[in-house]
Regions:
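Catalytic cores of nucleotide-sugar-dependent glycosyltransferases that transfer UDP/GDP/TDP-activated
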Residues: 1-479
C-alpha cells in the first residue's frame, strides 16, 4: 500500500511537541511492515544545516494561493527507508519558529495545496493520505472540492488524526474561498463554519474518510463538553468513523541498554539503575542517597501539565517526607520562577533545571525511581512511556493516554506498572505519591512494579497494525 503522511513537524528536523515524535516514529514502523510510506513537511528555516545539506532537489511547481501562484520547491532525503519531502518556499517558511504568525492561515493554506500539487511532480499516487492536526486538515476538503474531477487524485482516501483538539486553526471566511479556492457551499454548520469563521480542524473531521486520535480515553473525552472545545457534538456524531489509537515511542532511540547519554547502560537490572540514580544525584548536587526515593518531572512548564497541583503540595511533601524531587523543563515564566525558588528553599531535596536538554532528560528517566505526570489533560503523552521504558515508575492522573498506558499497581496480584489518581485534586495526588513511596520501601513490591514498567512493550508495532487495518478498511470500502 502507498501511504503519504502530511504534517507540520517531524523529529529530528523540526520539533515543538509530541506530534514531531509521532511523525518521526510511526512511518518507520509502517515501513518495517512493508508499506511504501513517505512524509511531506514544510522546509523551515530552523531545520539544522546538516539535514539541509543532505537534501536533494526533486523538482518544483507553482501553487495557487488566491489570485497568485507561489513557487513550490520540492526537496527530499531518505531516513531509515522512509523518503521525507520538504516543501520549499522562503516567503512562508523562511522564518524563525513554526507557528504564531498573523498569516498562519495563508501559510498552511499554501502547504495544504502544495501537498497535493507535489504528487504528480514526484509521480506518487498514495492509496491513503494521512493528515495530522489542523495544519493539514484542509487536504480532505480540497480533494473533495477542488481536485474531485482530476483523475490523478480520484483514488486517494484520507485519514485525519487529532493530536491535540485545543489547537484548531480558526481563521476568517476569506481563507476558505479567496486563498484555498474552495466553494462557499462548504461554509455551513455541517461543513467548516465555526462561529462565523473557518475551522481547519473541523474540516478534517467532517471530510476525511476516517478520523483517529491518540488514545481510546481521549477519543471518549473529546466527545464531552469539557474536553471537546466546541467540537464535542460533531465528534459524538462520528460513531465508528472515530478511533482512538495509543501512540508508541521509538524503542531503538529510547533504549537504556544502548543509550550513550546515561551513566550506566542496563536492560532489566535494578542495581545498574541505582548507579544511574547516584550519578544523577551527583550531577545535580543533591546528597547521594540511593535509599531515598527520587521523583522526577520532564515537562513543559504550562498549566495543562498539572503544575498547580504540584505547587500546592510541594512544600509539605519536601518538608515532611523523605524524598528527592527533580524537574527539567521550560515554559511559563511564573512556573519557572516558582520552581527555582522552591529548589533554593530545599537545596538538599530538590533540583530545578529550567532548560531543556535531551541528554539530561535521558539521565532523569534513567536515574529517577518515580516519574510524576499529573496532567489536567493529556491526549496521549509520551513522557510516561519513555519513563517506563527506563524503569521509572509513573505517577499519573487518569486522563487521556495516561489512563490507557499506566495501570495502578495492585499489591495483591502484583499487576500494574504505576500509580494513578482520578480527580484533579492536590490532596489525591499527595496521597498517591505517598502510596508510591510506601511501596518503594517494600523491596518485594518495588521490584514487581519496576519490572512491570521496564518490561512493557512501548513500541509502535501494535499501534501501526491498528493504523494498517484502518487504511485497508477505507480503501476496500471505496474499491
Amino acid at each position: 500500500m502507498k501511504l503519504l503522511f502530511a504534517a507540520s513537524e517531524c523529529g529530528p528536523y523540526i520539533k515543538t511537541g509530541g506530534l514531531a515524535d509521532v511523525i518521526a516514529a510511526l512511518p518507520k514502523s509502517l515501513h518495517g511492515m512493508g508499506e511504501d510510506i513517505r512524509v511531506v513537511l514544510p522546509k523551515y528555516r530552523g531545520i539544522p544545516e546538516d539535514y539541509r545539506e543532505r537534501m536533494a532537489h526533486v523538482g518544483e511547481t507553482r501553487v495557487r494561493v488566491g489570485w497568485r501562484e507561489q513557487y513550490c520547491g520540492i526537496e527530499s532525503l531518505v531516513e531509515d527507508g522512509v523518503t521525507i519531502y520538504f516543501i520549499d518556499n522562503e516567503y512562508y517558511f523562511g522564518r524563525d519558529g513554526i507557528y504564531g504568525y498573523m498569516d498562519d492561515g495563508e501559510r498552511f493554506s499554501f502547504f495544504n495545496r502544495a501537498v497535493l500539487e507535489l504528487l504528480p511532480v514526484i509521480d506518487f499516487q498514495p492509496d491513503v493520505l494521512h493528515c495530522h492536526d489542523w495544519h493539514t486538515a484542509m487536504i480532505p476538503l480540497l480533494l473533495e472540492d477542488v481536485y474531485r474531477h482530476d483523475p490523478y487524485y480520484a483514488g486517494i482516501r484520507t485519514v485525519f488524526t487529532i493530536h491535540n483538539l485545543l489547537y484548531q486553526g480558526v481563521f476568517p471566511y476569506e481563507v476558505l474561498v479567496d486563498l484555498l479556492g474552495i466553494h462557499s457551499r462548504h461554509f455551513t454548520a455541517e461543513g467548516v463554519e465555526y462561529y462565523g469563521n473557518v475551522n481547519f480542524m473541523k474540516a478534517g473531521i467532517v471530510y476525511a474518510d476516517h478520523v483517529t486520535t491518540v488514545s481510546p480515553t481521549y477519543a471518549s473525552e473529546i466527545q464531552t463538553g469539557y474536553y471537546g472545545y466546541g467540537l464535542d457534538g460533531l465528534l459524538s456524531a462520528q460513531g465508528s468513523r472515530l478511533s482512538g489509537i495509543v501512540n508508541g515511542i521509538d524503542t531503538k532511540s529510547y533504549n537504556p541498554a544502548t543509550d550513550s547519554h546515561i551513566a550506566m547502560k542496563y536492560r532489566s537490572g535494578l542495581n545498574k539503575k541505582t548507579q544511574n540514580k547516584i550519578a544523577l544525584q551527583e550531577e545535580l548536587n543533591l546528597p547521594v542517597a540511593p535509599h531515598i526515593p527520587l521523583m522526577s518531572m520532564v515537562t513543559r512548564l504550562v498549566d495543562s501539565k498539572g503544575l498547580d497541583l504540584v505547587i500546592r503540595i510541594l512544600d509539605e511533601l519536601l518538608y515532611y517526607d523523605e524524598i528527592q524531587f527533580v524537574v527539567l523543563g521550560t515554559g511559563d515564566p511564573s512556573y519557572e520562577h516558582w520552581f527555582r525558588e522552591a529548589a533554593n528553599r530545599y537545596p538538599n531535596k530538590m533540583s530545578a533545571q529550567i532548560r531543556f536538554n535531551e541528554p539530561l532528560s535521558r539521565r532523569f528517566y534513567a536515574g529517577s525511581d518515580l516519574f510524576l505526570m499529573p496532567s489536567k489533560f493529556e491526549p496521549c503523552g509520551i513522557s510516561q512511556l519513555i519513563a517506563m521504558r527506563y524503569g521509572s515508575v509513573p505517577i499519573v492522573r487518569e486522563t487521556g493516554g495516561l489512563n490507557d498506558t499506566v495501570h495502578a499497581y495492585n499489591e495483591y496480584t502484583g499487576e500494574g506498572n504505576g500509580f494513578s489518581f482520578k480527580d484533579y485534586n492536590a490532596h489525591d495526588m499527595m496521597n498517591t505519591i505517598r502510596r508510591a513511596t510506601a511501596i518503594y520501601r517494600q523491596p518485594e513490591h518495588w521490584r514487581k512494579v519496576s519490572k512491570n514498567a521496564l518490561g512493557g512493550d512501548y513500541s509502535w508495532n501494535v499501534s501501526a497494525k491498528e493504523y494498517q487495518e484502518i487504511y485497508q478498511q477505507i480503501t476496500k470500502s471505496h474499491a
